């Protein structure tokens, strides 16, 4: 069966990347056709940055690369799921996962606040990205 | 800390929903402000369907509801991660997860095919949705 990704108007699919060992969601990002091809071809995660409008190999600045254990696609082929071995931390803030804050209900109507969880920094982003 | 979701031009954030027991990604969908509020308020997953342009309680047609164990948001608050207890199957095709096909490399340049994995149907969609 052919892999026929269904790109959105911007030429992108959504990518969910999880830690192959724990199942934790590390990040949500986007891929264009070239990022998909390079990821499949090399076994390393490549993404497309909407803010920088550029193809991007995960870890090319930070060294925090992702080795792909498995790639899957969903029922309508507009999303992919990468199970990876993450070197260090996935988040640009230095946390293991971008999802380091829990949404907790504060009001019966659905009002909520954020609570930090698993939020230790594994690297110092100022040092790593030399900002 | 306030939860300040960063909605896209269509008023949506991306939602990744995983099985709280296994860590498997069940589905990727979208939420608008009202879907977020109802999910937080009720502890059941609500989404916004772009194709139907409608708010949607997961399982309202199929009975395959999702009880939220935890909700998190990511570093830029444009995505949420739901860990859920899934009743039956998450996918409209009757599979447990929408991600029932693996992307496998067939060519060195990144060409790929799809291989079915974990693709048993837990319900018959024709019967459940009465199409």
UniProtKB/Swiss-Prot annotation, chains A, B:
A Gene Ontology cellular-component term: cytoplasm
GO biological process, one term: L-histidine biosynthetic process
Required co-factors: Mg(2+); Zn(2+)
Residues involved in Zn(2+) binding: 75, 91, 98
Subcellular location: Cytoplasm
Keywords in alphabetical order: Amino-acid biosynthesis, Cytoplasm, Histidine biosynthesis, Hydrolase, Magnesium, Metal-binding, Zinc
Cofactor binding annotation: Binds 1 Mg(2+) ion per subunit.
Keyword set includes Cell membrane: no
Listed EC numbers: 3.5.4.19
Domain of life of the native organism: Bacteria
Catalytic class of the enzyme: hydrolase
Listed pathway(s): Amino-acid biosynthesis; L-histidine biosynthesis; L-histidine from 5-phospho-alpha-D-ribose 1-diphosphate: step 3/9
GO function terms (MF aspect): magnesium ion binding; phosphoribosyl-AMP cyclohydrolase activity; zinc ion binding
Reaction equation(s) it catalyzes: 1-(5-phospho-beta-D-ribosyl)-5'-AMP + H2O = 1-(5-phospho-beta-D-ribosyl)-5-[(5-phospho-beta-D-ribosylamino)methylideneamino]imidazole-4-carboxamide
Signal peptide: none
Subunit structure of this chain's protein: Homodimer.
Similarity field: Belongs to the PRA-CH family.
Protein purpose: Catalyzes the hydrolysis of the adenine ring of phosphoribosyl-AMP.
NCBIfam families cross-referenced by the UniProt entry: PRK00051.1
UniProt name for this protein: Phosphoribosyl-AMP cyclohydrolase
Organism: Bradyrhizobium sp. (strain BTAi1 / ATCC BAA-1182)
